[in-house]
């Protein structure tokens, strides 16, 4: 069972949490997340903190990059840690259903959730709260990257298509597809963030 490991590091490079992802898309447990409590338990060590401190530590340990980002600059929040690896000053959520409302109070936070029904619904909520979100629809309208990719993928031997994303659902997919097509559209992602409610159509 080969898995990729993404570490959540403190400024002193100590591991406070990590997530593993199965390299095979057919594994039932594709993502496994280890918060700081589980790390200590697996090593048979005691985490000497109060119950209140433990709650805070567990939350921080599953917010990937939270202790590394500079909140004086633009911070991009993603649904997953892997996406956050591809953009500087980013945070990745390790659990899809976690609330992020407390981050809406931070003026430098913007959101790039997944290009699917759930991700778009979450971003619509953020837009209503006046937060910057990524306009997937506008991005594809301008770049035609999704159409170019469909055409490129159809030219790939059917037996080899499983190696490639079926759709562009997140930043990880987007970067891979841009690489395959030798397209420089990823250099211009920042202009597709907006907090205007008039741009809801382009989500």
Question: Language-model segments: which ranges?
Answer:
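TOPRIM fold recognition
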Residues: 16, 71-75, 81-203
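Phosphate-handling DNA/RNA-contact segment within nucleic-acid enzymes
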Residues: 1-107, 113, 122-123
